[in-house]
Amino acid sequence: MALAVLRVLEPFPTETPPLAVLLPPGGPWPAAELGLVLALRPAGESPAGPALLVAALEGPDAGTEEQGPGPPQLLVSRALLRLLALGSGAWVRARAVRRPPALGWALLGTSLGPGLGPRVGPLLVRRGETLPVPGPRVLETRPALQGLLGPGTRLAVTELRGRARLCPESGDSSRPPPPPVVSSFAVSGTVRRLQGVLGGTGDSLGVSRSCLRGLGLFQGEWVWVAQARESSNTSQPHLARVQVLEPRWDLSDRLGPGSGPLGEPLADGLALVPATLAFNLGCDPLEMGELRIQRYLEGSIAPEDKGSCSLLPGPPFARELHIEIVSSPHYSTNGNYDGVLYRHFQIPRVVQEGDVLCVPTIGQVEILEGSPEKLPRWREMFFKVKKTVGEAPDGPASAYLADTTHTSLYMVGSTLSPVPWLPSEESTLWSSLSPPGLEALVSELCAVLKPRLQPGGALLTGTSSVLLRGPPGCGKTTVVAAACSHLGLHLLKVPCSSLCAESSGAVETKLQAIFSRARRCRPAVLLLTAVDLLGRDRDGLGEDARVMAVLRHLLLNEDPLNSCPPLMVVATTSRAQDLPADVQTAFPHELEVPALSEGQRLSILRALTAHLPLGQEVNLAQLARRCAGFVVGDLYALLTHSSRAACTRIKNSGLAGGLTEEDEGELCAAGFPLLAEDFGQALEQLQTAHSQAVGAPKIPSVSWHDVGGLQEVKKEILETIQLPLEHPELLSLGLRRSGLLLHGPPGTGKTLLAKAVATECSLTFLSVKGPELINMYVGQSEENVREVFARARAAAPCIIFFDELDSLAPSRGRSGDSGGVMDRVVSQLLAELDGLHSTQDVFVIGATNRPDLLDPALLRPGRFDKLVFVGANEDRASQLRVLSAITRKFKLEPSVSLVNVLDCCPPQLTGADLYSLCSDAMTAALKRRVHDLEEGLEPGSSALMLTMEDLLQAAARLQPSVSEQELLRYKRIQRKFAAC
């Protein structure tokens, strides 16, 4: 992409679309024929992601002069500048788009009035844009965010109710406000207060234009900044420039369904404080509080400045600057960083004694040469100002400017110091100080670590070692990184798999080396991931006493007086039960990552999709509800699979078929949104992968249409489960049933009923077969029962379905096992059922053919206190409903009569019998189809259809799976329990 300069053309031609560009004559661009499109993006932005597509027109009648030497120019309107969040004279990257993507479908919103009038040729449109007169708004586009609206585009028009009609050009209101003109003596000595917000880079305070006018300050003026709290007397005021904060370029937001004209990027009364300045001020990065702003009145003017000029007062330059490199686990303190520091101080920097300076290292040659991978392993280096030498400045603190022209820089060694947190360009979830969905755990971890950082922390007894437990991918490392960033601690992450060795002595040496390295960069947190790998012998079966003794010594015998600043250890594990007891007791603090609630999953999804274009039909709240039981890693995998599904959809749609690599790149530059079908496909893939694990919860896809008959049974089940969900106020009255027991002959649809209830009520379904929980090891069976209920609580709202319950919970005292395993399993199951009263969104459904074999304690109130009999279908009407439900997806010949088929069947049939009937009929149809294909009597492309003959042949061979004597026995059992 070539570099170009944007120039505002005023007045902009009224006959030209406001989001088009005019090419002055003599420029390097090709002839602006009909249909020429340019892709624009700000020069400083990453080339990844979509660009803005604009129509390029010739501008010979605009009164412009011939293009001279220098960068090419693009003549634009102020509306386009606002969309790009740029000013006149800004640099952009532009390239000609040979084949802009053609839109296959577009949704237009219009108020009462005329619709879209006739157009000549295709029209370049963008999602969220208001088209020229008559002014419909583009609400949604497919497959790209922007493209050509032409004769091949299918249009859907809807009426905008209660929405303002937004126009891209609004006359004089689009002009920026005039700069403030305030005399310096008019506000001399005035102290103002602003609410601080962490963000921005450099050493400048970012404010809105209206806030700058309210403060009576000039753009780029120097001010003293200090905390407004009375208790913050330990930190001295700092110097900073005041800059107007301009909107940032984000095409996904500007082309969103609800996008509108850009306003101020920051509300009045707020100031965007850079992270380094906030750290040097001693502010809490999460609670900045109020800041006192006072104008820097007394300044110095350089003696070489002569003549009549107007300069804002500023701090003097330092003659000498003595700094120390801050020890960090990410870089060496012995390297030669003269070139890095020289390039950093080519721009004047504010320095004060005791400040921590952040020096970026991106693109520095010295950093690349010092890295064995030839890639930078860290984004910044930190230095601490030890001493400044210069003329005594006026003001509440000694603040200077330092640069390569006026200042001599001296490196005087290394030091131990906390460092500020710096925002990155990555996803807001991983780099956030308070990761969405994990805020409470971060606060809890900070509360454990913070006392050691207080002035009297060295006098505290004990250690601050923390054991963090949670399943894989739940965000343990993210939580530790956020806590370290919040407290200004260095983080040294060490996977315990890298500490394992052939002998105990080698493991001991590695452990001591890691702790020694961590002590050299205090205050720090040493993060040991998968700590359960330590303390095991080579076979992984026994415990290594020597390694455990060394680890306990390193964790517990740290002298707090000699460890200031402190070194704290956080260990993570996904299998706390495998952690040796001696290692676990060395951690006085234990934290567990809780299961994500629906609201937390929603906040994580919003953070992950913050910079992704989404279709208007995507409902993140509904998606979060369907992701019950997911951890942070699963939600990230969901976004990855959704993006892959969107790319596959675009390639298979025919739009990208046959295009060159350049054309596909232009399609990506236009941007394409993630649709609800992409998320649905990705969610299905993840749930299929999870279902391969034992007892993985998921929402089934069985509806009431798949369940024929059983109307009374459906009613009883819905009253038991759906009523508490729709009317939670009844729970305060104690009107809640814990469990539901379905009993009856085999094949009557008990499992299908439970799945249909889970689907219709949007509940997660956890199916458990009774025998699969029984284990040969002592205590393992009871643990399996506990894990089932723990997974259900994590995936709440959830239904636990116990199939073949009589094999899991028989009457106690009658089992023949010598160890009493079944009795203990029943006792554990009873204890878990009693604990469901505190969990309102977990329901238990059991299914059995023999309720008389169950332990009587299971049928008492508060457990399986609702018994529902699911019997066979004995009347033709119920059998017809079941048969219709089974065959509703089949292709039947018009001559097929299901009533006549049932007349040829035995009188008493279960749902499994009718399913067997349809299966046999389908097998007969397949055999007939194969025979016809071999004889050439039927084309291979014709659909397979069931005939009346196929169904009658299957009905003639059908035998009931439950005899009349067995049905009578089940009815006697039903009467027995109904009388109780």
From Swiss-Prot:
Q: Which GO terms describe its biological process?
A: peroxisome organization; protein import into peroxisome matrix; protein import into peroxisome matrix, receptor recycling; protein import into peroxisome matrix, translocation; protein stabilization; protein targeting to peroxisome; protein unfolding
Q: Which residues bind ATP?
A: 470-477, 744-751
- Keywords assigned: Amelogenesis imperfecta, ATP-binding, Cell projection, Cytoplasm, Deafness, Disease variant, Hydrolase, Membrane, Methylation, Nucleotide-binding, Peroxisome, Peroxisome biogenesis, Peroxisome biogenesis disorder, Repeat, Zellweger syndrome
UniProt GO MF annotations: ATP binding; ATP hydrolysis activity; protein transporter activity; protein-containing complex binding; ubiquitin-modified protein reader activity
Q: Which Pfam families does its entry note?
A: AAA, DPBB_PEX6, PEX6_vert_N
Q: ATP-binding: present as a keyword of the record? A: yes
Per its UniProt record, what CDD domains does this chain match?
RecA-like_PEX6_r2 (cd19527), RecA-like_protease (cd19481)
Question: Catalysed reaction(s)?
Answer: ATP + H2O = ADP + phosphate + H(+)
Q: Which cysteines are joined by disulfide bonds?
A: none
Q: Which InterPro entries match?
A: AAA+_ATPase, AAA_ATPase_domain, ATPase_AAA_core, ATPase_AAA_CS, P-loop_NTPase, RecA-like_PEX6_r2
Q: Which parts of the sequence carry Omega-N-methylarginine?
A: R119
Main localization is cytoplasm
What quaternary structure, including any partners, is listed in this protein's UniProt entry? Answer: Interacts with PEX1; forming the PEX1-PEX6 AAA ATPase complex, which is composed of a heterohexamer formed by a trimer of PEX1-PEX6 dimers. Interacts with PEX26; interaction is direct and promotes recruitment to peroxisomal membranes. Interacts with ZFAND6.
What is the similarity comment for this entry? Belongs to the AAA ATPase family.
Q: What is this protein called?
A: Peroxisomal ATPase PEX6
Q: What is the lineage of its organism?
A: Eukaryota, Metazoa, Chordata, Craniata, Vertebrata
